[in-house]
């Protein structure tokens, strides 16, 4: 019996061994297959890159013309000067393509679909995917051809014609033509599309028509930013977005979308349709990119990290490559050798960095708020100790703001004196407006006995915002004003803005060397979805803005902007808080990071060829 058991046991073991050998052979075969697939994919990728390089050579006119000397290759044609800086970087001895560039956003991005997104974060992503007709040199600020190879402007300034380059394609391989440029304007201007902000911005354009390779923008009247508006308009592929204009239903499908993003830029979405809020934002190199220089990084990634401390931890752990520090952090981090040995610090005023403000909503749910009274708004500015905010919270890495215009440029009125913290002056203004402490409880009330009490809404997760608002709460109570901090997530905040459902809100506007305040201060922009979300209306201001916008002569335009600044200074629809320095750390493996006149050389708000790269020996995410 024991012998029979041993025989059965031997048969069983033999059978099991045969199965194990079969499994091992299958795994070996599968591994060989995967290895073969990986090799095949590498060859396909290599061929795709070679084809893209060949396409670029054809575009340059360098193919079949014999070898190109090093001296000749370093001189780009005039219409390719937008790529000169990236081309120079690509000639560095240690230049290499590859690696990933990973950044973070302090809020969750609600949508990446063009024209639906009104925030800086989505725009930051879109500019790597969607091209524009022109771009700007970050050092000289000169406008340069990008998708357009040239342009002409009529003598009266009302007509601008761009000539689109030949042979350009979108990331899906379909051709980019002047018709796509014209379509992009018609698409956003269609009332079925939920793009009131962009329609406002492009409202001066009366028509955009294509003719062969030419596309002509016609303006209703002279406008000082006409060239910039036309040249920086996002170019969308008609074959991809056109179907959303077919009916109200398809337009609503577009309006509800969050990830419809396809363009001709140096990067593309992994899928141009599937991204959803909360997903990792991941772009991959567009191997069909038409530019003189291809994108250096294989992937461009943004993580949503909504808590400041968590962002810092992620940066220290190497999870993100570029980190914008808070002032207190920056002061400590630049003295930490463990940080500076692996990351390079940059400290600068970005002219496009804009300003932080508190906006006072003047009409809520159809009723006037206390902030409809100019004296109340001015009192709140006197109660806002902005210099203390700069000194104690921002550690001196900021300037107190007294208006929307860049104090380092010509647009700001140099004769306006910034209001200082003054509780007595604030109390006097509140009393003039009818707010006094009627029952001696330390809180001022209106004539109807209603306390002056409100909430300031601001983005949650930001320690700086939190510290500022908590400081203001303590300062306001000195004059008997009650304020409750109201931190909310970014999507909730955007909804509150669109519905004008807040008392006061603290946010920031991006800036430039010269800006147009029509979008957020003109009475016409109080419409639903418009950026005058505080319902501020002033016919005098409207007229000044309109006159400044149509004045093409800079010497005559600046005095008009000074009048706009003076009126805003008097009216205080916003309490302008401060303009921060950009305090940035960049991983030291990333080369050619520079501070230029326009800020860090990443392109900012413009589509611009990437100049950064990582030498092959230092690449972290190579395949």
Model-inferred region functions:
Residues 255-256, 287-334, 474, 482-484, ...:
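Ligand-site clamp/hinge motif
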Residues 85-87, 99-155, 186, 262-266:
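N-terminal lobe/hinge region of extracytoplasmic solute-binding protein
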Residues 15-24, 60-72, 77, 81-85, ...:
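Detector for C-terminal structural segments
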Residues 188, 207, 270-282, 303-367, ...:
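Extracellular/periplasmic solute-recognition and catalytic clefts
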Residues 43-50, 149-194, 213-218, 311-314, ...:
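Aromatic- and charge-enriched surface segment that lines or borders ligand/interaction sites
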Residues 124, 131-142, 234-294, 299, ...:
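Gly/Pro-rich hinge or "lid" segments in bacterial periplasmic/extracellular proteins
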Residues 94, 163, 198-247:
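Surface-exposed binding/hinge segments that line
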Residues 107-123, 147, 174, 226-236, ...:
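A structural "hinge/loop" feature
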């Amino acid at each position: 019996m024991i012998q029979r058991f041993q025989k059965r046991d031997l048969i069983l073991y033999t059978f099991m061994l045969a199965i194990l050998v079969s499994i091992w052979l299958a795994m070996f075969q599968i591994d060989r297959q995967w290895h073969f697939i990986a090799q095949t994919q590498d060859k396909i990728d290599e061929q795709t890159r070679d084809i893209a390089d060949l396409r670029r050579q054809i575009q340059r006119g360098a193919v079949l013309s014999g070898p190109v000397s090093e001296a000749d290759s370093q001189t780009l044609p005039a219409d390719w000067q937008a790529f000169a800086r990236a081309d120079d970087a690509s000639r560095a001895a240690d230049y290499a393509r590859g690696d990933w560039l990973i950044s973070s956003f302090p809020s969750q991005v609600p949508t990446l679909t063009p024209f639906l997104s009104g925030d800086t974060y989505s725009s930051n992503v879109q500019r790597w995917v969607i091209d524009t007709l022109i771009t700007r040199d970050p050092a000289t600020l000169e406008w340069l051809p990008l998708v357009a190879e040239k342009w002409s402007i009529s003598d009266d300034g009302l007509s601008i014609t761009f000539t689109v380059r030949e042979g350009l394609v979108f990331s899906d391989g379909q051709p980019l033509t002047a018709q796509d440029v014209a379509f992009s304007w018609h698409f956003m201007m269609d009332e079925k599309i939920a793009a009131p902000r962009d329609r406002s911005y492009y409202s001066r354009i009366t028509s955009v028509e294509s003719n062969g390779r030419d596309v002509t923008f016609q303006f209703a009247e002279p406008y000082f930013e006409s060239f910039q508006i036309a040249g920086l308009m996002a170019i969308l592929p008609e074959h991809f977005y056109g179907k959303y204009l077919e009916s109200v239903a398809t337009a609503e499908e577009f309006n509800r979308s969050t990830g419809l993003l396809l363009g001709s830029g140096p990067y593309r979405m992994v899928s141009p349709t599937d991204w959803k809020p909360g997903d990792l934002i991941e772009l991959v190199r567009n191997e069909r990119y038409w530019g003189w220089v291809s994108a250096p990084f294989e992937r461009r990634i943004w993580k949503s990290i909504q808590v400041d401390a968590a962002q810092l931890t992620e940066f220290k752990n190497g999870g993100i490559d570029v980190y914008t520090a808070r002032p207190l952090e920056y002061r400590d981090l630049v003295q930490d050798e463990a940080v500076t040995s692996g990351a390079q610090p940059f400290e600068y005023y970005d002219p496009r960095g804009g300003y932080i403000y508190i906006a006072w909503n003047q009409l809520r749910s159809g009723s006037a708020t206390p902030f409809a009274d100019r004296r109340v708004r001015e009192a709140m500015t006197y109660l806002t100790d902005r210099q203390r905010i700069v000194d104690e919270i921002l550690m001196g890495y900021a300037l107190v703001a007294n208006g929307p215009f860049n104090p380092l440029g010509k647009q700001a009125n140099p004769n306006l004196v910034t209001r200082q913290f003054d509780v007595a002056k604030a109390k006097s203004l509140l009393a003039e407006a009818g707010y006094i402490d009627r029952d001696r409880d330390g809180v001022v009330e209106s004539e109807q006995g209603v306390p002056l009490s409100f909430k300031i809404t601001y983005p949650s997760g930001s320690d700086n915002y939190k510290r500022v608002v908590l400081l203001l709460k303590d300062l306001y109570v000195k004059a008997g004003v009650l304020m409750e901090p109201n931190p909310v997530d970014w999507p909730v905040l955007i909804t509150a803005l669109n519905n004008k459902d807040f008392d006061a809100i603290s946010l920031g506007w991006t800036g430039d060397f010269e800006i147009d305040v029509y979008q957020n201060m003109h009475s016409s922009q109080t419409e639903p979805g418009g950026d005058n979300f505080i319902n501020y209306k002033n016919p005098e201001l409207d007229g000044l803005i309109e006159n400044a916008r149509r004045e093409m002569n800079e010497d005559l335009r600046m005095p008009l902007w000074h009048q706009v600044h003076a009126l805003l200074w008097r009216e205080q629809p916003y309490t302008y808080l401060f303009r921060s320095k950009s305090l940035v750390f960049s991983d030291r493996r990333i080369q050619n990071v520079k501070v230029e006149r326009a800020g860090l050389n990443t392109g900012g708000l413009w589509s611009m060829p990437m100049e950064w790269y990582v030498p092959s020996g230092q690449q972290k995410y190579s395949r």
